[in-house]
């Protein structure tokens, strides 16, 4: 399959998890537009995977200066092929405090990330928020969209998760969507991506993969304030997911 077909299959697989996926991206980019007054923004797609946010940024802001940072060899290969000549691709580990040294520039108008940082330990996320702040220009924004249940609605949040799982399994059963595991099995069977999948397993051994960690949005807002952002709050919410924003 070509890189563009892999992009499309990634989108379908992810949309099965998050039917309102595009809404969070639209909210992010609307915030970017608001703080750049119509000029082309400088954006960092953090833990950007195959380039989901980067592609949407370039579609909305054709003159944008985009950098994508990730560590996954498979997703970086897809991103590199589909974003060639349109974005700077950076291979870096967000678990390493020196990750910013690999960036081609700083002073970003926006650092955007989605459904990625929940794989990091809590203490690392809190520290990372401060490091991200240093990559922003004064007045720039950081937006993190992820699984962030509303802690004051535990019963409804649980039911929303359960119902989402039921609908997702129905999509898998009907063949309308590919599951996470099936998508990666297809990667491993692809002649071009299989070597990258082997490399990926060395970086993220299945047996030692850190468990997902999904605190409520308020935890993230508090962490942003502690990290020195002048303003922090919830930008968007959809069910048990939310996007928090911090303003430098």
Task: State the predicted function of each range.
Residues 1-38, 52-56, 143-172, 176-179:
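Conserved class I S-adenosyl-L-methionine
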Residues 115-119:
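Short catalytic micro-motifs in class I SAM-dependent methyltransferases
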Residues 126-138:
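A short glycine-rich, Lys/Arg-flanked "PGG" loop and its adjoining helix->strand segment in the class I
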Residues 212-227:
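Short alpha-helix
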Residues 227-248:
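Core SAM-dependent methyltransferase catalytic element
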